[in-house]
Amino acid sequence: MIFGAAALGRAQDEEAAPILELLLEYGINHIDTAAMYGRSERRVGTWMDSHRKDFFLATKTGERTYQKARDQFHHSLERLRVDSVDLLQLHNLVEPAEWETALGPGGALEAAVEAREQGLVRFIGVTGHGTTIAAMHLRSLERFPFDSVLLPYNVPMMQNAQYASDFEALATVCAERGVAMQTIKGITLRPWDEREHTHDTWYEPLTDQADIDLAVHWVLGRPNVFLNTAADMSLLPSVFDAASRAGDTPSDAEMQALVERRSMAPLFT
């Protein structure tokens, strides 16, 4: 399990403190934040003086050029109150033109490699959203030996035949090369559309504990994948509780029944 610290994006210090206790209670030792996540890095930074050794710390840059990515990353270190992080990720490399810039000469990747050479970063990863991201991650791995990828994985997404095919191809390559496969959007119910936003997630999430159990157990039932938690503090206890009870992987019939019962729909089409 990975704590998706986007959940702290709008949190005050007094709201963030109980989250740390929750992470320690459930033994969650991987924090994933980003320069773009509002107050998140600063909130995580308040924990680092006394708890840096307890966590694998990951952040992201959304910049595409060397100088901007370098500057943004160094500001992240300041906000996080650390000398180094474990993982720096190039965030949301989906659009081909941005991909070419970030991974080309003078691109953000050069800043990440420099940071690793300077001992500021141990690993370099790439993240993204949407139906083409699995294919784009394969392309990224052809260009550079990234240590990790991050992308959506849930039942509605995997009912998209092309996405499922690309995801499986990516999973094969990751397994062969020892690339960490991090997944997001695990408890997505459907897009908000015109419905009232009742959570901080940018999709409508599953909220019933039994439904969250099925969704979380389905993701964690796949070997060699990590599950990143949703960007809403109120959902964390339910997700952590589900993960702590993970056992047998739900059957296809159980998951299809969940899809139909809750009218689940893919976030990306």
List each language-model region with its residue ranges.
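N-terminal binding-site loop/beta-alpha segment at the start of enzyme catalytic domains
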Residues: 1-55, 111
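Conserved, mostly hydrophobic/aromatic
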Residues: 3, 31, 44, 57, ...
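Short, acidic/polar
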Residues: 11-24, 66-81, 131-141, 210-216
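Acidic (Asp/Glu)-rich catalytic clusters
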Residues: 24-25, 45-54, 74-83, 114-116, ...
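Short catalytic-loop micro-motif centered on adjacent basic/acidic residues
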Residues: 29-35, 58-60, 122-127, 226-228
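A short, structured active-site edge motif that brings together acidic residues
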Residues: 54-65, 87-91, 151-153
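Active-site groove signature of glycoside hydrolases
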Residues: 77-100
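Beta/alpha (TIM)-barrel catalytic core signal, keyed to glycine-rich beta->alpha loops juxtaposed to Asp/Glu
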Residues: 93-269
